[in-house]
Regions:
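Surface-exposed molecular-recognition determinants
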Residues: 1-16, 137-192
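Residues within well-ordered beta-strands of beta-sheet-rich folds
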Residues: 6-10, 45, 51-55, 108-110, ...
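Acidic glycine-/aspartate-rich tracts in secreted/extracellular proteins
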Residues: 11-15, 25-29, 57-62, 70-75, ...
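Extracellular/periplasmic metallocenter environments
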Residues: 21, 60-63, 85-138
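N-terminal edge beta-strand
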Residues: 22-48
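Extracellular/lumenal carbohydrate-interaction signature centered on repeated Trp-anchored short motifs
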Residues: 43-49, 114, 174-180
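N-terminal V-set
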Residues: 62-88
Length: 192
């Protein structure tokens, strides 16, 4: 074998993030988008133990109750999930029936250990969502750049670990720190 160098660190203890959810028309097909990232059916990465908030206050969501389940268009998943309309905790049935009339809409999920493959979808219309990876995830989906990345962030320490797949052309990658970093190290994972 050859010589190897490794860096090992932990960027944060518990993942968590708030995603702003909107519905976008892609050539006549409504799809969910996150944080204004203009790509449909993205696969979300949510770390086990992390708490994530999905904010559906935008008017484009009014008739599209955002749901999480174990199948692409159904089978509601409830472990670790709390639904809120206008700041009040609701059952899933109350959430979907009162969704359109609410001013503020939130879905909170604390991803349990060994959570199954999950999906996000609209409870009223099929084909609007995508997959959620939970097992062995090393961070949370980040839509701050021109390409999607996964970031493990400790903003108070000023440190993040970001993974992404390049496109072969110029792109920007979000780091999740909220301020411009002073330095960064980039290592290609497929180089010998």
């Amino acid at each position: 074998g050859g010589n190897s160098v490794g860096w090992f660190w932990k960027a944060g203890d518990t993942d968590g993030k708030t995603y702003t959810v909107k519905v976008h028309d892609f050539s006549g097909n409504n799809r969910y988008i996150f944080d204004d990232f203009q790509t449909q059916a993205v696969t979300l990465d949510l770390a086990e133990g992390g708490t994530y908030i999905f904010n559906m206050d935008d008017a484009t969501n009014a008739t599209h109750p955002f749901s999480i389940g174990t199948a692409a268009n159904g089978t509601v998943y409830t472990s670790g999930i709390t639904y809120f309309l206008d700041g009040v905790s609701k059952t899933y049935s109350q959430y979907t029936s009162g969704f359109a009339a609410a001013t503020t809409r939130r879905l909170h999920i604390t991803v349990p250990a060994s959570a199954p493959q999950l999906y996000y979808w609209c409870s009223a219309h099929s084909g609007m969502g995508g997959a959620i990876n939970t097992n062995s995830t090393l961070g949370s989906s980040n839509f701050a750049g021109s390409i999607q990345s996964t970031a493990k962030v400790n903003a108070s320490a000023g440190f993040s670990i970001v993974t992404f797949t390049g496109t072969g052309s110029n792109a920007t990658v979000g780091h999740g720190l909220g301020v411009t970093p002073q330095a960064f190290i980039l290592k290609g994972r497929n180089f010998e």
